[in-house]
C-alpha cells in the first residue's frame, strides 16, 4: 500500500504492518521460535510485480535503448530499480537473476532485461528495496507501460499474458 508516495504511513511497506501480518500467519500455524521472522525473510524469494517504463518513441531520449523495456517483447526483469544512480534502490544479486532467468527459459517465458531509464533522467522506485533490506531475494518483474502515470497508459496484451505465465511459473518453482 502507498507505494506511489514512498510506501510511508501506517499501512505502507515502510511500516511494521507487513512484518506484523507475517508474524500473525506464523502464530496461526503455531510456529514461534526466536528470530523466526528474520529467518523467514532470509529464506524467501520474491518477484516485485510492478510495471516497467516502456520506451516512448516521443521521448526516447530518456531511455537507455540498450537496456529499455520494449512493449510487445514480454515481461521486463529489472535487476536494478531506483533513481539518481543507486539511491533508494534495489539491485538483485547475480545468482537470483540467474535463477529467475533459468526458470523462465525452461518454461518458455518471453522476458527482457530492462531498466527504468537513464541514470539521473529516468528511474523510479518500487517496494523491492524494502524487502531486499529484510533479506528477501527480490527482482522487479512487470509489464512495460507506455506513458506510465499519464491519463492514458498503453500496454501489450502479449506482455500481460507473458506476466501471467511468468508469475505462474515462479509460484510453481
Question: What is the predicted role of each segment?
Answer:
Residues 13-20, 91-99, 122-125, 158-165:
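Conserved active-site and cofactor/substrate-binding residues in soluble primary-metabolism enzymes
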Residues 56-59, 63-152:
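Active-site-adjacent substrate-binding region
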Residues 22-30, 55-56, 101-104, 108, ...:
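Structural signal for hydrophobic packing residues in well-ordered secondary-structure cores
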Residues 7, 15, 23, 44, ...:
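Generic serine detector
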Residues 143-173:
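His/Asp/Glu-rich mid-to-C-terminal helical/loop segments that flank catalytic regions of hydrolases
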Residues 1-70:
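Acidic/histidine-rich catalytic neighborhood of metal-dependent amide-processing enzymes
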Residues 15, 32-33, 93, 113, ...:
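Alpha-helix initiation/capping motif
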Residues 26-32, 76-82, 143-145, 169-173:
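Short C-terminal domain-edge/linker segments immediately following a structured domain
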Amino acid at each position: 500500500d502507498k507505494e506511489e508516495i514512498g510506501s510511508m504511513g501506517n499501512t505502507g511497506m515502510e511500516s511494521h504492518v507487513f512484518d506484523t501480518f507475517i508474524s500473525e500467519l506464523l502464530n496461526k500455524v503455531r510456529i514461534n521460535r526466536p528470530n523466526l521472522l528474520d529467518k523467514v525473510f532470509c529464506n524467501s524469494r520474491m518477484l516485485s510485480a510492478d510495471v516497467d517504463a516502456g520506451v516512448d518513441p516521443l521521448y526516447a531520449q530518456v531511455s537507455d535503448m540498450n537496456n529499455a523495456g520494449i512493449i510487445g517483447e514480454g515481461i521486463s526483469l529489472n535487476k536494478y530499480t531506483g533513481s539518481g544512480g543507486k539511491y533508494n534502490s534495489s539491485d538483485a544479486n547475480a545468482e537470483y537473476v540467474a535463477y529467475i532467468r533459468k526458470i523462465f527459459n525452461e518454461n518458455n517465458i518471453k522476458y527482457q532485461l530492462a531498466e527504468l531509464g537513464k541514470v539521473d533522467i529516468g528511474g523510479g522506485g518500487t517496494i523491492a528495496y524494502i524487502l531486499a533490506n529484510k533479506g528477501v531475494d527480490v527482482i522487479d518483474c512487470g509489464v512495460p507501460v507506455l506513458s506510465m502515470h499519464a491519463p492514458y497508459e498503453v500496454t501489450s496484451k502479449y506482455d500481460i499474458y507473458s506476466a501471467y505465465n511468468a508469475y505462474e511459473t515462479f509460484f510453481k518453482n
